[in-house]
């Protein structure tokens, strides 16, 4: 992808957040095969009975290619009763920051893709929050680290197809198909009413908005 050359440099060292899903496993393989210097970080929240299999998938890939891999296992008892996603996000970025300090890098690469952008725009519209940037930025500062997202121009299916075409093992998180959280509801319910033409119009409108 052209965004790799635009956003990533061979001489830099990157923290790569990998969940074990097709998005991050595809990005992991792309960066590894291209020769980028990467340190893999995986967070196991132990919220699903099969979450250890996600961890094993990430560890197996890293072992195969002799890549440094760090895992943060979190006791689910630390979660408060409300807003798990925000709590998980803070814990995840704290982990990235700790590993980044160990290796003297503040650059974190994540596998957000165009489907995530579309979901973000829809959620912003639902909240009437359209004054700032719509969607997801390729580069942003989050909790003390610089986050780089080189996959925003491609759809999730592209990353899934990449895994199939390159024999990259990945895991599907069944909770992504539920509707408990707002993002999951938007993905699995709201966007079912959006055809490709409507999605393209939405993306074009957001792009024009962000260029003002």
PLM feature segments, named:
Residues 181-212:
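ATP/NTP-dependent adenylation/nucleotidyl-transfer catalytic domains that generate, transfer
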Residues 1-188:
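Core alpha/beta nucleotide-donor-binding catalytic domains of modification enzymes
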């Amino acid at each position: 992808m052209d965004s790799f050359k635009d956003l990533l440099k061979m001489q830099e060292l990157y923290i790569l957040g990998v969940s074990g899903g097709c998005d991050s496993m595809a990005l992991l393989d792309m960066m590894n095969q291209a020769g980028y210097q990467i340190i893999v970080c995986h967070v196991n929240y132990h919220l699903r009975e099969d979450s250890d299999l996600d961890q094993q998938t990430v560890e197996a890939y890293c072992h195969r290619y002799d890549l440094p891999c760090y895992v943060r296992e979190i006791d689910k008892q630390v979660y408060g009763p409300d807003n798990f996603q925000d709590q998980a996000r803070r814990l995840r970025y704290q982990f990235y920051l700790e590993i980044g300090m160990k290796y003297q890098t503040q650059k974190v690469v994540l596998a957000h893709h165009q489907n995530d952008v579309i979901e973000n725009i829809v959620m912003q519209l639902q909240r009437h929050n359209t004054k700032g940037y719509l969607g997801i930025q390729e580069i942003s500062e989050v909790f003390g680290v610089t986050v780089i997202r080189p996959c925003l121009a491609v759809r999730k299916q592209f990353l899934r197809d990449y895994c199939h075409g390159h024999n990259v093992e990945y895991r599907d998180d069944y909770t992504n198909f539920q509707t408990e959280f707002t993002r999951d509801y938007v993905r699995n319910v709201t966007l079912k009413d959006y055809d490709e033409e409507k999605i393209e119009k939405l993306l074009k409108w957001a792009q024009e908005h962000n260029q003002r």
